[in-house]
C-alpha cells in the first residue's frame, strides 16, 4: 500500500512537470521539451488523475495569452467582472484539456490494451502506436471544433522543419502520433537506464530512425513545383481592437485604406490584401480602387451578419464577391441560441453567423484556399480546398489584443499548412504576423509585428497535389486498424 501511494504521488509530480514542459514546448517551440513532456505522460499513464494534471498544465501554460482578454470594459463588461471572466475562460480551457488527456489514458487502460502494456517491448510498441494514432486522429477532429486547437502535431515548428516535412504524407495528426512515439522511446530509455537494463540498442535504433525520418522529410520539402507568380501587397493595419470603433479610428481607417491602395499600386502590386475585420458591414471605399482588393470585413446576408473576405474589383468602390468565415470563435463571435435570448457574444460587432464549410474560393485572380483566423488550424479542410484546385493559401486574422506568443503559434500553424499542402501561404493580420510562408515551411517576415505598413511580395502558385491532400487521414486510420488487428491477434494467442 505504501509503495502504491508513493507511485501515485510520483506520477502526480511527473504529470505536473510533464504538463509544464509541454506548455513551454507548445507556446515557445522546441521538440526537446515535447519529447521529455510526453515521456512524463507515458510514465504517468497508470493514473488518469496524474494524466489530467499533464493536460491541465499544458493548456494553462500554452494558452495563457487568453488572459489578455482583460480588460473587457470596451464591450460593456464591468471592470470588476472583467478579470474573473478572463480567468474563467482560461481555466475552463485547461480543464477541458485535462479531461481529454485523462479520457485518452482511460482508453489505454481497457483490457484490450492493458495486457500489451505489461508484455514484451514489441507488444508494448503496438500499444503505443495504437494510442498515439488515436491521439493524432482526435487532434484532427478537435481542429474542426469551435475551439482554437494547437496540439502536439504543430509543436515541431518552427525549429524542426525537416521532421515536420513528413506532414506532406500524413498531416498534423501523423506528427502528433510521431511525437508521442518518440516520447515513449525517451521514457523507455530512462526506465531501462534506471533499472540497469540494456538500453544502448534501443537508443541506437531510435537515433537511426530519427535520422531516416529527417532525411525523408527533407526530400519531401525539396519536392516543389510552381506554375506562375503573383505580386501581392499586404497591408498590416495595426489598429488596436479596443480602439477600432472610436470616432477617431472610424474616421481615419477609410483614409488609411485609400492611402495603402495608392502605395500598393505605386509598388507595382497585382492586388492588395487587408486583414480580418478591416471593413464594417456596408462600408464602401472612398474612391475607386486602383487595383483589386481582398479585404477582411463584415457583410449582411438575409439579416445575418457574416465575417468575410471581400473582393473589390479594380475601379470599384463596393465589393463584388466574398467568402464567409465558417468556423466562429466561441464567446467572441458565437454563443448557442436560447429561447428568448439574443446573445451578441464578447464582440463589439455583435453575433456572427457561419458561412459555408468549404474554404475554396475562385475569383478573377485565380483559385485559392482561404482561412479566416482560427480556420488555419483545420488542415484537413484546407487540404480539401487544395484538392479542389486552390493554388495558394491566404490566411487573414486579427490577433489583437493577444501577445506575441499567439502570433508564434499562428505562424507555426501556417508553416504546417504550407508543408501539408505543398502550397505557399500568405498571412495578413491586424497586428501581425504578416508574412509569407513557403511550401518548404520557411518563413519570410514582411512587416514587423505591431507596426502599420504596406509590404509587397511575389508568391509562386502551384497545382501539385501532396500525399496528404490526396489521401487525408486515410493512412492514419488504415494504420490504426492494422495495429488493432495485430493486437487482437496477439490477444487471441495469449
UniProtKB/Swiss-Prot annotation:
Ranges of residues in domain CN hydrolase: 235-461
Q: In which pathway does it act?
A: Protein modification; lipoprotein biosynthesis (N-acyl transfer)
Its keywords, alphabetically, are: Acyltransferase, Cell inner membrane, Cell membrane, Membrane, Transferase, Transmembrane, Transmembrane helix
- The answer to keyword Ribonucleoprotein applying to this record is no
Q: Which residues form the signal peptide?
A: none
What family does the database annotate? Answer: Belongs to the CN hydrolase family. Apolipoprotein N-acyltransferase subfamily.
Q: What does this protein do?
A: Catalyzes the phospholipid dependent N-acylation of the N-terminal cysteine of apolipoprotein, the last step in lipoprotein maturation.
Output this protein's name: Apolipoprotein N-acyltransferase
| Residue ranges crossing the lipid bilayer per the database entry | 16-36, 41-61, 62-82, 133-153, 173-193, 202-222, 468-488
**Cellular component terms, GO, for this chain's entry?**
plasma membrane
Q: Which residues form the active site?
A: 276, 325, 373
Q: Name one GO biological process term.
A: lipoprotein biosynthetic process
Cite a single GO MF annotation: N-acyltransferase activity
Taxonomy of origin reads:
Bacteria, Bacillati, Cyanobacteriota, Cyanophyceae, Synechococcales
Keyword Zinc belongs to the record? no
Main subcellular location: membrane
What topology in the membrane does the UniProt record assign? Answer: Multi-pass membrane protein
